[in-house]
Amino acid sequence: MGKTKQKQDRSHYLFSNRELANLIGPLVIEQLLAVFVGMADSIMVANVGEAAVSGVSLVDNIMILIINIFAALATGGAVVAGQYIGRKDEKSACKAATQLVWFVSLSAVAIMILVYFGKDIILNQVFGHITAEVKGHADIYLLIVTASIPFIALYNGGAAIFRAMGNSQVSMRVSLLMNAINVTGNAILVFGLRIGTAGVAIPTLISRMVAAIVITALLCNQTRILHIERTLKIRFDGRMIRKILAIGVPNGLENSMFQLGKILVLSLVSTFGTYAIAANAVSNAIALFQILPGMAISLAITTVISQCVGANDYEQVHYYLKKLLAIIYVAMVGTVALIFLALPLILKAYNLSDQTAAAATNIIHFHGISAMIIWPLSFALPAAYRAAGDAKACMYTSIVSMWIFRIGFSYLVGKYMGLGVFGVWVAMVIDWVVRAICFVIRYFNGKWKHGAIV
């Protein structure tokens, strides 16, 4: 009888199984699209030449850093809006969405202007001693792609707002449109018109512009739970923006430090030789597929948990968090198993040397097994804390763990203990273990429950 009553009670919970499936499915497809398109872009750039690959790669490191900052701000807006939805305060939720769109857009324009003014510093100082040919390709790519910063920031903000209301299908469809334009444009301009690096950059700008316009137009639909005001008059609400920044700034710092850490680790990997660089690059691409379900469902966790916290119902928070973590574990076991089975064929497609293929195989097996066990607790669990407003604790834990264990132990295990590139991946998993321990302790002590933003 108790179990039956409990099941009946859960029928009144915020998200049914069908609603969770409708939320998660498009998110997985969207993440899959992003990974595939990234790989397609790399192949197309490679056809322009090695100097172009180097130039584009250097600029992309800067762009990823900037995009991550605005993605973090978008998460802040989504959490605030989601908590208001949970409180049934749709007016305040819409105000949060409007403030997010304006703040992100204007901030992105300011960053774009700064990048243009600092272009020479980036090319000559940040990128260090690069050849004139590489610098030429980087200059062209940076000049064009920088103009897309406001558009990708606006798209990310809009996508986060749609996810906050539980509608991930819109962001998936707009992402599909954006990526289709990008890939088609690259194919035409790179292979057809053969205009080199500009042929890679122009479709990126156009696709992001179209995505921003489409998602903004959809957000102006006043019949949606979350929508933005149809006005060009800017009215900033300092109190609402502070709430968004309370999540966005710690999350942005965490993401930025993570990207910086990756760059520092790459510089270490480069000292291990050409085979190590190749094995690391291939392993990174394949490892992304192993954790893809986790990344997608972590976005769903932000939506679900923020609404439950807004409703001040922590019984639902615990229920959905355990349920979504279980789904991540099952999905990642299946994904990793498939990749293990297909790994010989995947590595064959890369045409690697025996030494590089052996190193990549060891890394992928180690990463896959570790990811199935540790990754959800290291990265999906803190997504719930951010959704509950506990972003600062996540930031402190992640940054300290990354600098000491991921970076410090990369040198210790990889360089001084002689494990080379494999040691760098061992250090990364040590970082995961430390994060997981800290986040599990925080789950049980309950301190993350006291950070609700609204």
Show the residue positions of the predicted features.
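Small-residue-rich hydrophobic transmembrane alpha-helices
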Residues: V53-I113, I152-S171, L266, I277-L343, ...
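Short runs within selected transmembrane alpha-helices of multi-pass transporters and secretion channels
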Residues: A74, I144-R163, S171-N182, V200-I215, ...
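Helix-terminus/linker motif at the lipid-water interface of multi-pass membrane proteins
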Residues: L32, F36-S54, L123-A132, I188-I195, ...
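Short alpha-helical transmembrane segments in multi-pass integral membrane proteins
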Residues: M1-L27, A81-S148, G192-V249, I305-A371, ...
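Transmembrane helical elements of multi-pass membrane transporters/channels
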Residues: N22-D41, I144, M178, S207-A211, ...
